[in-house]
């Protein structure tokens, strides 16, 4: 699990540009999932059937994107000024 977390942290995924994260998650999920779907907005939906029927099956939701930073300029003292994306 630690190696998976490290791999995810190394991926770039600012809002609107999450494809690297999505493809990594798809590759990790497909071997153990019953069905994997990407919807029109890029959400990755993974289905895994349980061994028994339960009234309220568990659901795991998470963001794939991260806040991105754009360096806009450097001031006279060499400090960078950033804008956020996402």
Show where each model-derived region lies.
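N-terminal hydrophobic/helix-forming segments and targeting peptides
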Residues: 1-86
């Amino acid at each position: 699990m630690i190696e998976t977390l490290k791999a995810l942290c190394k991926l770039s995924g600012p809002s609107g540009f999450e494809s690297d994260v999505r493809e990594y998650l798809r590759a990790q999920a497909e071997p153990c999932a019953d069905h994997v779907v990407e919807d029109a907005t890029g959400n990755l939906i993974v289905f895994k059937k349980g061994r028994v029927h339960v009234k309220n099956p568990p659901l795991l939701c998470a963001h794939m994107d991260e806040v991105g930073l754009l360096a806009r300029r450097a001031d006279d003292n060499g400090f960078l000024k950033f804008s956020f994306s996402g």
